[in-house]
Curated annotation (Swiss-Prot):
It comes from Eremothecium gossypii (strain ATCC 10895 / CBS 109.51 / FGSC 9923 / NRRL Y-1056) (Yeast). Its EC number is 3.1.-.-. InterPro entries: AB_hydrolase_fold, PGAP1-ab_dom-like, PGAP1/BST1, PGAP1_TMD. The gene is BST1. This is GPI inositol-deacylase. It is found in: Endoplasmic reticulum membrane. One of its GO terms (biological process) is ERAD pathway.
Length: 1028
């Protein structure tokens, strides 16, 4: 007992010395200074006003930056689409086949005039390959129409011969109708959708078993379904494989559009986080333990496509598959990377953007195989097709997919005399256009040197018809003749299948998408081979095309170079704070495709500005830049370099795990015409950097204000316990700012490096009360992540902490000012409308020293509490009751100001209830999404199971405390043990610390902490010695 008392005294002494060092006199002095007119403001007030003004200014700048339009390559360039949709309800799929058959529905899409319609028996006889489309959060089943229509038009149209698949077949698109459910906010809804889709796949496969057309065709019946998911629909597709009703091997190809694979976009519901952990653990184990179940490693492919910077619904970084799906089974790509698309796309447009839907439709038709029961090609062929269709072809890993590796369609040519070969050192880039056509030999032979690590072959052309371009890669070949001596010849192959498409860049070109699919202009074609591939061959034979194939602006540029093609620019963000990084392209010594690598610029949070100046007249094309990152596969093309270029990247992002051994460097691949010297300067674009803070830290708007409000409440209760006076929130906030703001700012800076220490991460993980965070670092050594605080790994980004802190202070003060303004208005209105009699009566009833309640009011509060508890147990989620309690607390604050009395007890009641109202206001955004889900389901006349949200204990303390507040009681400041006071203060401090460290990724748990604190406040407000 003595040791416990000694601990209490020591703890109280430490708190008094180090934490709450301002006293009541300071607060009262500030109150008097605020109320007195003409008095000079104190230094503390000026300090607070400076911090508040700075935060408000930063908030306005961030909002203005967020609302400002994108420029250059980040501008949206999607074209509108036309289609003739029709939807056939699959009426047979009802509650007999799925318990959710009344809530959800299944439709079959038919493109009018293309797909087979109803037959004479008023049924649709399917003969294609099944595809299931899963809409996303609040999505509709009709979103399937764009991709499905493009697939039908491509298959039944004139472009069918362009498909690289002799075994392709028409696709039957089924689409799920989820009544626009909010999948991202409610875990139970996500599980329901996954369960329904598994039942739908079972039913879809049974339809084909009954199809007369399929039996007549002699083709094997389908055993799997291709799945296309938009937004959260892509996550539903992956969750499907983890459920018990999943049919084994029924899914082997998943294509997702803007789906947040790596982390949940919203953390309002703990079930969502648990589902993500279980899903990612399941998929990771399937690829890790391939000996037990080889199906996933040998058959399943997952492709993630994201729209990039224009996606304002969720950060594009969240779509990464890194660390979840091996590179042999899937990858993430950006629409700016995809050939023939080359434009960023917003979250909704990604399902209808004309350029993308054509590419996706072509890919789907090339992935399928009607002769296989799985109806898809083998995994290596699917992945190779996906990489060729969705990646730029300039990635470091792209050479593995070139046909030049294993091309055996040999063309035998006569032996070339050694004197006809031109070495790379003797040769300048070969430029062929209308002006130089007659100066070039008809045949040109380029000798390929060996043991040259920097050897590169590059070709760029604007010719429309590649058949006019005759280029061969040859080996010296000895042909044995049985009737005579050995004959020497050359064995050559054509690289025609390895050409990649890059955006057109002439003087009148503005945007990369101007040469995308369906445009009037055609893109450039290019070849780019490294030394490893070239080492298989001895020389290159190039024959110039016919002169009639050249238009005035057409050109062919060929180069075999041994010059170092990559330049490393060793600048870091700290150096860019002081000056810009300058580098140059020298046309006389550098290859026309030169790469500038920035190994220390890898943060997705920082945007850069690139200023370019170049010289040269009559350039055959305008220089352009391919900005790229190898993981994830993001390439962005920049034209019109005379204007400032904005560099935005998606590499190392907050809260996103990444593999540490991958190269995260930013690469700027400059493609320059001959005789064009270029100077480049790179600096930080602060305005665009602030623009991207909002999309990545939206959840901080709920977490950080709750932290500050809790910290101020801890100080309010400390002063209340020491003086029996409960100060108002705004005044305490000013005192806290003047006393602790420098310390808090320093802490917000130091938290970033501290929480990146491996030992600290493990410690924080072990102390996490929610138990839903599962940092990849703990499971795999090569996976890095920062799951706590702001999710930042770079020391340079430590400034984000103080910036968000200033903005948080401004937001909290404006909320407190709003409540104070409401109270002031209520008092003024009450002053005019209330009579002296009613005031006297209310004083007698409400503000008796012994708090003698009217029995009628007490009875009504008890009945109301019982109804709310019963409603939570039987029907509504506790989040809805929280919203109602917020309104009750607001009513209490209003009533306290309607009957205003200038007494200490009334002041305590008013300040305490106003502060608690502000605390509830900070928790309200956390609970609001679940209320939307409930009201949406209620409107659809269906009650989705809220299993984890019917726990009355999750709201009971708040119910009782709010009702207790309505009875005008306040936690006692006297006759209370010292340890109880420390528990109250410590609880608020813990809530404040939790909201900072865990809050952004665990918002749902903040409600439970507030609930526990409310229970404790209720306990301290009880007078256990009283009969009441």
């Amino acid at each position: 007992m003595c040791s416990v008392l000694r601990f209490q005294r020591n703890m109280a002494s430490w708190v008094k010395r180090h934490v709450f060092t301002f006293d009541l006199g300071d607060i009262q002095e500030k109150r008097g200074s605020d109320s007195g007119s003409g008095q000079s403001r104190s230094t503390a007030d000026r300090y607070f006003n400076a911090v508040f003004g700075l935060g408000l200014l930063l908030f306005c700048i961030v909002c203005m930056a967020y609302l400002s339009p994108f420029l250059g390559s980040d501008l949206p360039q999607c074209r509108s689409v036309t289609m003739y949709p029709s939807y056939a309800l699959v009426q047979g799929f009802d509650r007999r086949f799925s318990r959710l058959g009344r809530k959800y529905h299944l439709y079959l899409y038919r493109e009018a005039g293309k797909d087979n319609g109803f037959s004479d028996d008023n049924e649709i006889h399917l003969d294609g390959i099944p595809v299931l489309f899963i809409p996303g959060n609040a999505g509709t089943y009709k979103q399937v129409r764009s991709i499905a229509a493009a697939t039908a038009n491509l298959y039944y149209g004139e472009m069918r011969d362009a498909l690289n698949n002799n075994n392709t077949k028409n696709l039957d698109f089924f689409t799920a109708d989820f009544n626009e459910d909010f999948t991202a906010f409610h875990g139970r809804t996500m599980l329901d959708q996954a369960e329904y889709c598994n039942d739908a796949i079972r039913y879809i496969l049974s339809i084909y078993e009954l199809s007369d057309k399929y039996r007549a065709s002699g083709e094997p019946l389908p055993t799997s379904v291709l799945v296309v998911g938009h937004s959260m629909g892509g996550i539903v597709a992956r969750v499907m494989t983890t459920l018990k009703n999943h049919i084994p091997q029924s899914i082997n190809t998943i294509l997702t559009l803007s789906s947040p694979h790596s982390t949940a976009p919203a953390t309002f519901d703990g079930d969502i986080l648990k589902i993500y952990n279980a899903m990612n653990a399941f998929w990771e184990s399937k690829f890790r333990d391939r000996d037990k179940d080889p199906f996933y490693a040998e058959n399943v492919s997952v492709i993630s496509i994201t729209g990039g910077v224009l996606d304002s619904v969720l950060p594009a970084d969240y779509t990464s598959l890194e660390g979840i799906i091996p590179s042999d089974n899937g990858f993430t790509t950006y629409t700016t990377t995809i050939p023939w698309v080359w434009t960023p796309i917003d979250h909704l447009a990604i399902v209808w953007c004309d350029q993308l839907r054509i590419v996706v439709a072509k890919l789907l038709l090339e992935l399928v195989d009607r002769t296989s029961a799985s109806k898809t090609r083998p995994l290596p062929d699917r992945m190779r097709l996906a990489r060729r269709s969705l990646l730029s072809g300039l990635e470091s890993s792209a050479s593995a997919d070139f046909h030049l590796w294993d091309n055996e369609d040999y063309i035998f040519q006569p032996k070339v005399a050694p004197g006809a070969l031109t070495t790379a050192q003797e040769m300048s880039p070969i430029l062929l256009n209308v002006e130089t056509y007659d100066t070039l030999n008809e045949y040109n032979y380029l000798a390929i040197p060996h043991n040259e690590p920097n050897l590169r072959f590059s070709l760029l052309t604007s010719l429309e018809n590649l058949e006019e371009l005759h280029i061969l890669f040859c080996q010296n070949y000895n042909e044995h003749n049985s009737n005579g001596p050995i004959e020497y010849s050359s064995r050559c192959v054509s690289p025609s299948q390895d050409f990649i498409h890059v955006p057109r860049s002439f003087e009148n070109s503005k945007y990369p998408s101007e040469s995308s699919v369906g445009s009037a202009s055609l893109p450039f074609k290019a070849l780019h081979f490294n030394q490893t591939l070239l080492s298989k061959y001895d020389f290159i034979k190039f024959r110039k095309p016919s002169k009639s194939s050249f238009k005035d602006e057409d050109f062919v540029l060929v180069e075999l170079s041994t010059t170092d093609w990559q330049t490393t620019v060793n600048c870091n963000p700290f150096q860019l704070l002081l000056s810009s990084a300058k580098f140059a392209h020298n046309a006389s010594s550098a290859p026309f495709i030169q790469t500038f690598r920035f190994p220390y610029l890898s943060s997705s949070l920082v945007s850069y500005k690139l200023d370019v100046s170049y010289t040269g007249e009559n350039l055959v094309f305008e220089p352009f830049i391919a900005q790229s990152i190898d993981s994830p596969f993001e390439t962005k093309w920049h034209l019109r370099l005379r204007d400032s270029v904005t560099i935005t990247i998606h590499s190392e992002a907050p809260f996103i795990p990444f593999e540490s051994h991958y190269d995260k460097s930013v690469k700027l691949r400059l493609i320059a015409p001959p005789d064009c010297n270029i100077n480049l300067s790179l600096s930080i674009n602060w305005y665009m950097t602030l623009k991207f803070l909002f999309i990545r830290y939206r959840l901080a708007v709920a977490a950080l204000p709750l932290s500050l409000v809790s910290f101020v409440l801890a100080n309010q209760f400390a002063l209340y316990y020491s003086s029996s006076f409960f100060p108002d929130f705004s005044t305490t906030l000013r005192a806290v700012t003047s006393k602790f703001w420098l310390k808090l700012t320093l802490s917000s800076i130091l938290l970033t490096p501290i929480l990146n220490i491996s030992f600290i991460q493990r410690l924080i993980h072990s102390l996490d009360p929610s138990g839903v965070n599962s940092p990849f670092l703990i499971r795999k050594k090569n996976i890095m992540t920062a799951a706590y605080y702001l999710g930042i790994r770079e020391i340079f980004m430590c400034w984000i902490g103080p910036l968000l802190s200033c903005i948080t202070l401004s937001l909290v003060y404006m909320l407190a000012f709003g409540i104070s303004t409401l109270e002031s208005c209520v008092r003024r209105v009450s002053c005019y409308m209330s009579t002296a009699i009613s005031k006297t009566r209310m004083k007698e009833i409400w503000l008796k020293d012994e708090c003698e309640y009217e029995e009628g009011l007490v009875l009504r509060r008890r009945i109301g509490s019982g109804i709310m508890i019963l409603a939570v147990v039987l029907y509504v989620p506790y989040q809805l009751v929280f919203v109602l309690l917020f309104l009750v607390q607001l009513n209490t604050v209003i009533k306290l100001n309607i009957n205003y009395f200038n007494t200490k007890r009334h002041s305590n009641l008013r300040n305490y209830n106003s502060s608690y109202l502000l605390l509830m206001l900070c928790v309200l955004p956390i609970n609001a999404p679940m209320v939307f889900v409930f009201l949406h389901n209620f409107g659809r006349r269906w009650v989705t199971s809220f299993r984890s949200h019917h726990n009355c204990l999750a709201i009971l303390p708040i119910i009782l405390l709010v009702c207790d507040n309505a009875g005008l009681r306040i936690p006692r400041s006297h006759c209370i043990e010292r340890i109880s006071k420390l528990i109250t203060i410590g609880s608020f401090l813990y809530l404040s610390l939790y909201s900072v460290i865990y809050g952004i990724r665990n918002l749902f748990w903040a409600h439970h902490l507030v609930n526990l604190i409310s229970g404790w406040l209720l306990f301290t407000s009880l007078d256990l010695t009283s009969n009441n």
